[in-house]
Amino acid sequence: MLDVYSGSVHAVDELAYAAIALVDAGHPRAEAADLLAKKYADHPEVTAEDINDCFDDIEELKADGKLFAEDIYADHAFDFKNRSTVVKALCLHVAHTCNLNCEYCFAAQGKFHGQSGLMSFETGKRALDFLVEHSGTRHNLEVDFFGGEPLMNFEVCKQLVAYARSIEKEKGKNFRFTLTTNGIGITDEVIEWANKECYNVVLSLDGRKEVNDRFRKDIAGRGSYDRIVPKFQQLVKARGGKGYYMRGTFTHYNTDFTNDLFHMADDLGFDELSMEPVVSKAGSPEALTEADLPILFDQYELLAKDMLRREKAGHPITFYHYMIDLAHGPCIYKRISGCGSGTEYMAVTPWGDLYPCHQFVGDPDYKLGDIWNGVTNTELRDEFKLCNVYARPDCKDCWARLYCAGGCAANALHATGDIHGVYEYGCEVFRKRIECALMIKVAESLDPELAGRAATAAPATDEDCGDCSSCE
């Protein structure tokens, strides 16, 4: 049982669940106890003392702020339009071109429905300077080499990292680079560079060969699996434990996506995994449907149970969407406002234009400005400042609202025409993932062996609030 505002998760039996439900419905203690006594009259194992102890526990948890906690977040949401404009991360589109032609790609072969192009070193350098200039006192700055396919502009990627390293000490910053790649352009040089300079790498693979090659093809229509898998394996092996993710997309054609995850884990040797539902126009052959949802829910449950099995066997895998920290979770600000697109996080095109994130690139209505003049469309930025869970009435009664912070603005726009809208299909999937993530945590806490391992895991120490004062 999840207490929404405290974030506490309680493992309860049937009696406790019924007691909490009665309290939640407004029944006084004596009345609720009488109702439970009648309900369990034919269950001699449930005594009056058990019922009394149950309500004692409920009152103690309420007093400790771990059950029926009050909403302490709403007061932080109303003034978001006046929050700071510190920028902490950039998605650098170093290449608006690609050496694959994935049929489900929202970026239209990396061109984002515009012209192809490569970012120059001068433009990239100015983008890094823009980030430093607008980062305030924040120390850690995130930069993702993105596209298109960023390795089609590898020399500029190398030059930009070298430039960033040359100014880190002087500016008091630490640049953390991520490379997102389809793998076609990986070479020994790329592997050496990425494993030295990149805090994380994101490797695009949809799973089984036939699944991957259905959509992830080159211009000639040839599948990419056989060319990229050996390169990915070589890169991951050489990383020596540094961060990476296998990032797949599942569609209507592989709603059995756990088989793709298990293939990557068992057959290919990858243990850091992510799988995202395709976002396509309704009616597209690959688009997920309402009829797919029960299948997807079963798949997420199957994955969660299998992850527990693997953990007990000493061969755990990580699934990105099940990574949840109940003891050291996000701060209030992040719980409310999410990813920070359009404010703290922006995408930069090869020509230096600024957009709220990569999914808005190419839409003139969502151009924020450029890296030379900064954010000139301040009205649009103010709209993104207001993107938070309390700005979405449809989120009001959702138990998962403080885990998604209102969801993705781009998905909301594409589904409803409004960045403050709600992409309901995505909500259904998200809630199921959080449910499974919480189940894993509860199962770990109830298993002595797994609980011991969890207790020895280091808490997150990567928080860098910089100039953010939203929690104060």
Where are these predicted regions, by residue range?
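Canonical Radical SAM [4Fe-4S] cluster-binding loop centered on the CxxxCxxC motif
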Residues: S84-T85, A89-E122
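Detector for the c-type heme attachment site
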Residues: C105-K111, G241, W399-A400, L413
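Long, K/E/R/D-enriched contiguous segments that form extended
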Residues: T258-I332
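Short, small/polar residue-rich loop motifs at catalytic or cofactor-binding pockets
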Residues: C339-G342
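Radical SAM enzyme core and accessory elements
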Residues: M1-Y17, L22, G26-E31, L35-V46, ...
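Long, charge-rich, low-complexity alpha-helical segments
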Residues: S8-C91
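C-terminal accessory region of radical SAM enzymes
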Residues: P294-H328, H358-A405
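Radical SAM/AdoMet-radical enzyme domain recognition
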Residues: G124, L128-D144, N153-V278
